[in-house]
């Protein structure tokens, strides 16, 4: 049976029906542990719910945003399979897909990418862990397959008119390359927030770049308008049978390269890649599990399979921007319902750890979305203690924005469990800091931030340590507690990882102070636009911003807002249009900054 538990975090008025997918009949004695998750994908506190698994019910598809779709999904245990019960599908249609996949001309532009045994991962997990290296393609991504397959089936008349698409990433390069090969003008509409390196890459492949809109949705709307106005064929990034079949050629290669595969793990954004690979495998090697992998903060396919129809996420975490899709495709969703075995969710720190794993294997750096499937496959093997099986994960791309590497590095050690981020509250007295260092003992410091302040009794120390064994870390925390030094493990709290170490030095003791995290676009005028909305009406007490090499960035703000003005403040924040969460949604952060 299929299931997914949705649990509310505190009280969010924008998501009043967050619990609608929790079965009302909680009579089962089976108790499962889930955790809250905020809009960033950070771990919150655990929630135990007795669950009775409920089947997916078929309901009409939707194409518009759904207001009651939660922006916050619970964390199932990383690597745990969220089961989908395949419904089958029309055998004649599936067979035609298979024929078209086998006859696809994608090798006019694509190579048969290598399937490489990851020896270090294999040794660590006790399996034969293979990585399908789609990052080795000319455009460093699998996306050229689907774009070329669809475009190669257009008539010469359609090609002569030209094609158009909207993309800020790998699909744009795939369409540009296909247009170059087919002697066809390829117009690519990209948001004005697109990094220059990606714009230059598309132009280098002959793409006619049109910069329009601040978001992908605005760029896509403009592309569709130009398609209608100028008679240009629109090339969707995933939701077209031609695109799906092109991506499905990866399945034929994996099947040629390796037999007796336990499971193939596939990153899921809009669903084109997994739909294509599943269509091939479930007809040729049906015993091989086809498992999709999504980030917790962009789990649109997972949620859609649970609901039985496509749903649109109101907020999407863009850390793995290549799979940050709010609404999966109509064709792709149908194929996933019919064919795949389930979904696995991964956190941003797990994705970062997977990037490091691939780097350790052969000094290659994947983009964040390119490592999603590897993170999911590793977590699945660890959760189910899989041994001596053939495991395949698709490395879908390597178009890493260089400025994002610092964030990946910050998270990688935490995601692998080889490093821990801790906060210790220590009574300010002579010799106490030396005592603290002694209690850390053999756990090697990798970073430490401490500043004496006379304004509060307890000092805050933020630090990272290397961890060989979890038991060593647990003992150290207990030793701290016995010495009256309360210690918190903040390793999976991304807000803390991003911001808190820069704020050590004491609370400001400001009356009516509230904190908020806003997810804002990375562009020049963002901060001014933001401040215009609040200042000088409310006093700014804190501001912390860091470019992440991403579509969006985290902006941490403090404001002085009297309680009587909170409704007015929230209305102003809502009008601004940026996803945000205020005050004490992140308990660990508030405990640390207010201590």
From Swiss-Prot:
Query: What InterPro entries is this protein classified in?
Result: ACT-like_dom_sf, Ser/Thr_Dehydratase, Ser/Thr_deHydtase_PyrdxlP-BS, TD_ACT-like, TD_ACT-like_sf, Thr_deHydtase_biosynth, TrpB-like_PALP, TrpB-like_PALP_sf
Provide the activity regulation entry from the record. Answer: Threonine dehydratase 2 biosynthetic, chloroplastic: Strongly inhibited by 1 mM isoleucine. Processed threonine dehydratase 2: Not inhibited by isoleucine.
Domain spans labelled ACT-like: 420-492, 514-585
Please state what the protein is called. Threonine dehydratase 2 biosynthetic, chloroplastic
Instruction: Look up the record and name the pathway of this protein.
Output: Amino-acid biosynthesis; L-isoleucine biosynthesis; 2-oxobutanoate from L-threonine: step 1/1
Biological classification of the source:
Eukaryota, Viridiplantae, Streptophyta, Embryophyta, Tracheophyta
- Subunit structure as annotated in this protein's UniProt entry: Homotetramer.
Q: Which residues carry this modification: N6-(pyridoxal phosphate)lysine?
A: 143
Gene coding for it = TD2
Where, per UniProt, does this protein localize?
Plastid, Chloroplast
Keywords annotated in UniProt: Amino-acid biosynthesis, Branched-chain amino acid biosynthesis, Chloroplast, Isoleucine biosynthesis, Lyase, Plant defense, Plastid, Pyridoxal phosphate, Repeat, Transit peptide
Q: How does activity depend on temperature?
A: Threonine dehydratase 2 biosynthetic, chloroplastic: Optimum temperature is 60 degrees Celsius. Abnormally stable at elevated temperatures. Processed threonine dehydratase 2: Active over a wide range of temperatures. Optimal enzyme activity against L-threonine is at 58 degrees Celsius.
Q: Which reaction does it catalyse?
A: L-threonine = 2-oxobutanoate + NH4(+); L-serine = pyruvate + NH4(+)
Kindly report the pH dependence of this protein's activity.
Answer: Threonine dehydratase 2 biosynthetic, chloroplastic: Active at alkaline pH. Processed threonine dehydratase 2: Optimum pH is 9. Has little or no activity at pH values below 6.0.
Entry comment on modification after translation: Proteolytically cleaved by a chymotrypsin-like digestive protease in the midgut of the lepidopteran insects to remove the C-terminal regulatory domain, which allows efficient metabolizing of threonine in the presence of high isoleucine levels in the gut.
Repeat among the record's keywords? yes
Q: What induces it?
A: Expression is induced in response to methyl jasmonate (MeJA) and locally and systemically in response to mechanical wounding. Parenchyma-specific induction of expression in flowers and leaves by MeJA. No induction of expression by MeJA in epidermal, vascular or sporogenous tissues. Caterpillar (Helicoverpa zea) labial saliva induces expression in leaves damaged by herbivory.
Organism equals Solanum lycopersicum (Tomato)
Transit peptide feature range: 1-51
Q: Which cofactor does it need?
A: pyridoxal 5'-phosphate
According to the UniProt record, one GO cellular component term is: chloroplast
Tissue expression summary: Expressed in floral buds, 8-9 mm long flowers 1 to 2 days before anthesis, open flowers and floral organs including sepals, petals, stamens and carpels of 8-9 mm flowers (at protein level). Expressed in very early floral meristems of the anantha. Over 500-fold expression in mature flowers compared to leaves. Expressed in sepals, petals, stamens and carpels of the mature flower. In sepals, mostly expressed in the abaxial mesophyll cells and in petals in parenchymal cells. Not expressed in epidermal or vascular tissues of sepals and petals.
